[in-house]
UniProtKB/Swiss-Prot annotation:
The record marks 412, 444, 502, 528, 570, 632, 650 as: Interaction with DNA. Its EC number is 5.6.2.1. Belongs to the type IB topoisomerase family. The gene is TOP1. This is DNA topoisomerase 1. It comes from the Eukaryota. Residues 426-427, 490-495, 581-583 are annotated as: Interaction with DNA. Eukaryotic topoisomerase I and II can relax both negative and positive supercoils, whereas prokaryotic enzymes relax only negative supercoils. One of its GO terms (cellular component) is chromosome. It is found in: Nucleus.
Length: 790
């Protein structure tokens, strides 16, 4: 049949238009790509699929969120296109809009993005009809262990025992994963990936990228959030002007929060004490007998707290287990799992509401703190759940959730306004070990790896050429980019008056940077979490001259970069590389530093031939260099001095034992009995006259015994020397790392594949580097080949 030429032309034109449109959309997405700080999980993972051109995952029509205009159910609310991310923290974190407010992998959305004008706010009725509950045969129940799952699950108790730095995991299968075609290794190497509990990661990645309604048409199911138990008064009275004072439970709770910190350095800081009293006075009331903090004596409460701590230390394992079971572990198990796509059972990362540490942190850092309000006294929690899933019952009978959403464009399960800072929000997300989070984390490090293809061009042309630019704005952008690249500074954001006075690169004040000729810059400011950043660095002469110009004619409290903010800087960075932000720089510099250090000849020589403990020390020193670059500090613990004393005592004790063993060896070599028996008791001198008849037998026995004893003593000497060397090494490492926090960079900035590959190359069990939580978080990295380079 002959085709119509007109129709052919129309089809060809339509094809060209579609191809051009898809190309523009792809370019638009590339230009708008941002770091983990700025884009939601739904955008990063499924934007391609939603736009119809993803070759990774195909999504059916049933992935779209139900329209509020067509649904017969009044409580259905169409979710906004929120810019919300999956949190990497296991604790509930405020979603601050500033870059340095969190060290997690993601930030939180603005308040204006949370509401959709087209949404109708319908609260859940106080009593839900029974017939609204789904049939057990159709819906997966989180409280039942038989809920569908695509992997073997551990109990809550096993999952939560992940805090040790060096957990022993022995029940792992041994199976080499190193490709023979890529690496030939005669020596059998331990399989790092085999030391992780079996997680079918390849299958987990098939979980649909939207949460509310999955590929199979099954909804997201979870049980909401859990509240901490109400405060139980202990009844211990504090003193005011040496007289006992009666306090209400609420007053006592805040007083106890303060009292338990009596022996910390914060008690010497006037601002901390002022913030506490400002908060406490609001609860005490104007007419309360307590009027000033100087006359307060919290010692009785502190001593009570210390006694309680000591009691817990003295408890047996069974007693501790009984107490733990008394905290309603079954109830906790109910909240710690969510079912995604009706088949994948994922752990929820942060399902508890409220902590005392939030309040204590506000006293440390905030300009205008306030004691935490009870979120659940006025239910202020919004739940996001599948359309057909059963709505979780509010924890308080008779109450209702603030709002029920069925939003498939976001990844949070619940959120509420931060009770301390109402401008910020707290979210409940899936755990860091979930398959969705694993995919996001992997993509974060892949983005940072791409920077190595751009970095030389960025340094040579993108900012170096603008150091002496006549355009002041260009010059400020160039210098700020240089500082972010070379010093791994955070970008920084503007703060409200009631927020902590912390700064980043873009918010540096004139007083934060001093110039010392010929080209030294001295930095001194409070960074994230109010950690002080102090550093003297030598910079390029043109950078030094530019900083002097930026400081000229300004007061100490004026902005150093007065023509620059974070949004302008990030917009410029995205022009240099798609998705480039200050955090990508920071992640790149941290990972590339570790990669180069563990590959350098010096560390390779130190690692060769050593035992596992020596190799771990080599890795820790490389990790330390990264932590210093990122300014990951910690205060010296109160117990540090006591630990060093105990180590010294043990070393001296071992040296005494070594001396005795060496004396024994000398006596054995001379044919004499040792000074002590094998049981450590003094050896009795032989009376030869008394045992004259048995002398010959004794001599024969002594000769045979001497050889055995010589070998035994020699072995003990070697073992004792090894113990002394290990303790000396532990002592040196503990002293060297006392002010450095290694964990933060390991969790957020170091590509785990670098560490896993290093462990494989040097026969180091991965458990020696990653604790149980990190093993679960980085399950996706365990199959990396040992020749991996960042």
């Amino acid at each position: 049949m002959k085709s119509n030429p007109g129709i052919t032309v129309i089809k060809q034109n339509a094809s060209n238009v579609m191809e051009k449109t898809l190309k523009e959309e792809g370019q638009s997405r590339s230009n708008s790509e941002d770091s983990d700080d700025d884009k939601p999980l739904s955008h990063k993972l499924s934007s391609g699929a939603l736009n119809g051109n993803s070759h990774h995952i195909r999504m059916g029509s049933n992935l779209s969120c139900p329209s509020p205009y067509t649904s017969p159910k009044p409580r259905i609310i169409k979710g906004p296109e929120d810019e919300m991310l999956l949190s990497s923290e296991l604790q509930l974190n405020a979603g601050a809009s500033n870059a340095e407010s969190s060290d997690s992998d993601e930030s939180k959305p603005l308040a204006s993005e949370l509401e959709d004008p087209s949404s109708s706010l319908n609260k859940r009725p106080l009593i839900q009809p029974k017939n609204s509950d789904p049939s057990p045969s159709k819906k997966a129940k989180l409280s039942e262990p038989s809920a569908p799952t695509n992997r073997k699950l551990k109990t809550a108790e096993q999952e939560e025992a992940a805090a040790d730095d060096d957990p022993s995991i022995s029940n792992r299968n041994k199976k080499s994963t190193t490709p023979a075609s890529k690496v030939s290794d005669k020596k059998k190497r331990p399989d790092v990936s085999a030391s992780v509990n079996k997680v079918d990661f390849s299958k987990s990645l098939k979980v649909p990228l939207v949460l509310v309604k999955g590929r199979n048409g099954q909804p997201l199911v979870h049980n909401g959030v859990i509240f901490p138990p109400l405060y139980k008064p202990h009844g211990v009275k504090m003193l005011y002007r040496e007289n006992p004072v009666d306090l209400t439970p609420e007053q006592e709770e805040v007083a106890t929060m303060f009292a338990v910190m009596l022996e910390t350095e914060y008690m010497t800081k006037p601002k901390f004490r002022e913030n506490f009293m400002s908060d406490w006075r609001k609860i005490l009331g104007e007419k309360h007998i307590i009027q000033n903090l100087e006359d307060c004596d919290f010692t009785p409460i502190y001593e009570w707290h210390q006694r309680e701590k000591e009691k817990k230390k003295q408890m047996s394992t069974d007693e501790k287990k009984a107490i733990k079971e008394g905290k309603d572990e079954t109830r906790k198990e109910k909240y710690m799992w969510a079912v995604v796509d009706g088949m994948s059972r994922e752990k929820v990362g942060n399902f508890r509401v409220g902590t005392t540490r939030v309040v204590q942190r506000s006293w440390r850092a905030s300009k205008d703190p306030q004691v935490k309000k009870n979120v659940y006294s006025q239910i202020d929690i919004t739940i996001n759940i599948g359309k057909d899933a059963p709505i979780p019952e509010p924890p308080i009978p008779g109450e209702r959730w603030k709002e029920i959403r069925h939003d498939n464009t976001v990844t949070w399960l619940a959120f509420w306004n931060d009770p301390i800072n109402p401008k910020e929000f707290k979210y409940v997300f899936l755990a860091a070990s979930s398959s969705l989070k694993g995919k996001v984390t992997r993509e974060k490090y892949e983005k940072s790896r791409k920077l190595k293809d751009y970095i030389e061009g960025i340094r040579a042309a993108a900012y170096t050429k603008d150091f002496a630019s006549k355009d002041s704005k260009k010059r400020q952008i160039a210098v700020a980019t240089y500082l972010i690249d070379k010093l791994a500074l955070r970008a920084g954001n503007e703060k409200d008056d009631d927020e902590a006075d912390t700064v980043g690169c873009c918010t540096l004040k004139v007083e934060n940077v001093e110039t010392k000729r010929p080209n030294i810059l001295k930095f001194d400011f409070l960074g994230k979490d109010s950690i002080r950043y102090q550093n003297e660095v030598e910079v390029e002469p043109r950078v030094f001259s530019a900083i002097e110009q930026f400081r000229s004619g300004k007061e100490g409290g004026d902005d150093l970069f007065d023509q620059l903010d974070t949004s302008k800087l990030n917009a410029h960075l995205k022009e240099l590389m798609p998705g480039l932000t200050a955090k990508v720089f920071r992640t790149y510099n941290a990972s590339i530093t570790l990669d180069e250090m563990v590959r350098c000849k010096l560390l390779s020589r130190e690692t060769k031939g050593g035992d596992v403990a020596e190799k771990v020390v080599v890795y820790q020193h490389a990790n330390k260099e990264v932590a210093i670059i990122c300014n990951h500090q910690r205060t010296v613990s109160k117990s540090h001095s006591a630990q060093m004393v105990r180590l010294n005592e043990k070393i001296e004790e071992l040296k005494g034992l070594l001396k005795e063993l060496q004396e024994d060896l000398t006596r054995v070599n001379k044919g004499k009995p040792p000074l002590k028996n094998s049981d450590g008791k003094p050896k009795r001198n032989l009376n030869l006259k008394r045992y004259k008849g048995k002398l010959l037998k004794l001599i024969q026995k002594l000769r045979k015994w001497s050889e055995t004893r010589r070998l035994s003593v020699t072995k003990k000497i070697a073992q004792t020397n090894t113990k002394i060397e290990k303790m000396e090494r532990d002592k040196e490492t503990k002293e060297d790392l006392k002010t450095v926090a290694l964990g933060t960079s390991k969790i957020n900035y170091l590509d785990p594949r670098i560490t896993v590959a290093w462990c494989k190359r040097h026969d180091v069990p991965i458990e020696k580097i990653f604790n149980k939580s990190l093993l679960a978080k980085f399950a996706w990295a365990m199959d990396v080949v040992l020749i991996f380079r960042f």
